[in-house]
Regions:
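PRPP-associated nucleotide enzymes
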Residues: 2-255
Length: 255
């Protein structure tokens, strides 16, 4: 079922003031470190924002800049995507696993992941995040969902989905780099739930989110875990994320 956009928290065009922080090595004083914009905080327990480290902010600075060429945009986006996948894997359940090392038969008490995972990309921008998932999880299954806005109703419409047959038995990493109003992502969640995937087994990964989109998601699906690199100031009158980075799909695939 398509989400009723009239029930979503709508943008007002009034942006939150972006917070700032001093970034640099911990051994330096704040007056020796530059001040930079960091993520807006949100009060939703199911939203995880990556630590606002100098590395992450430097990577985000590169992909936000309008002068960054396509090759660099792809390279730095992939680095952030890798950080997102690594963080998402931290939210999966594990089981105890004791192994024997090659050193004199010594044992090591460790853990192993519980259950199977798969990725699902919201086409086409979400496909840009698949490489990072494959680099972290060998032979991972990846499904696809195509959702586009209906020109007559202005509501998201499902055009296509191809998902693993046993997806209901897997943990799902849903991939889409930008979370604006959340309309398309909410429909994607509906598709997954319709296939029998439990809500608490879905993790939604994105590079940049708006406070409005994060709130819509958290309120409608409080058991879905959102993992994002940055929550921006908000949405403008055209529902563009501000300050944003432009059209991710265009910059990754064509520009």
């Amino acid at each position: 079922m398509a989400p009723d956009e009239s029930k979503l928290q709508r943008p007002t065009g009034v942006l939150q003031r972006a917070p700032s922080g001093h970034l640099g090595p911990e051994y330096k004083r704040n007056d020796e470190k530059p001040s930079a914009t960091v993520s807006t905080k949100v009060a939703h327990e199911n939203v995880t924002i990556l630590p606002q480290t100098p590395q992450l902010i430097a990577l985000l600075t590169m992909i936000r800049s309008k002068t960054t060429n396509r090759a660099d945009f792809i390279f730095y986006s992939n680095r952030i995507n890798r950080l997102l996948v690594e963080e998402a894997l931290n939210h999966l359940p594990v089981l105890p696993s004791t192994i024997t090392t090659p050193v004199a038969g010594r044992t090591y008490a460790g853990v192993k992941f519980q259950g199977k995972i798969c990725g699902v990309s919201i086409m086409r921008a979400g496909e840009a995040m698949e490489q990072a998932l494959r680099e972290c999880c060998r032979s991972v299954r990846i499904g696809k969902i195509l959702i586009q806005r209906d020109e007559e109703t202005s509501r998201p419409r499902l055009f296509y989905d191809k998902l693993p047959e046993d997806i209901r038995d897997r943990w799902v990493l849903l991939l889409d780099p930008m979370l604006a109003t959340g309309g398309s992502a909410l429909m994607a969640i509906d598709v997954l739930l319709g296939k029998g995937v439990p809500e608490e087994r879905i993790l939604f990964l994105n590079l940049i989110a708006s406070p409005e989109g994060a709130a819509n998601f958290a309120q409608r699906y409080p058991k879905v875990r959102i993992v994002t690199a940055f929550v921006d100031e908000g949405l403008d009158e055209k529902n563009y994320i501000v300050p944003g980075l432009g059209d991710f799909g265009d910059r990754f695939y064509t520009l």
